[in-house]
Amino acid sequence: MPRMDDSAFERGLAVRKEVLGAEHVERATARATDLDRDFQRWITETAWGGVWARTRLDRRTKHLVTIAILAALGRDELELHLRASRNTGTAPEDIAEALMHVAVYAGVPAANAAFAKLKAEFSPQPEKAPGTSA
């Protein structure tokens, strides 16, 4: 596979870690095999070193767009980006507003599924009683 210059990869790796979290990126990189190593590099160079590194839209806005698209398409990566939205200052209330647009333009079932994931990610977890185990 033709490679972009190393600066695109390095820039993409830095942006990917800032948005998704270093632990997630390191796990994804460690799980790469000969079958998908070039694909992982391409994602880092193109999506993260290219599109996410552009400056016209701020990261919060990019995250709203990404979340809305993933919700509309029913993609598994929605949960990852809901978690990562904390890293870009994307408020759950703003995500909920974007999901209203998903409901109108992509369908209520898509938005309903996304709202369930949004609530699961941002709903307060019940506190454990003292002396109980996890």
Predicted segments with their positions:
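A glycine-rich phosphate/pyrophosphate-binding beta-strand-loop-alpha-helix module
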Residues: 93-97, 113-116
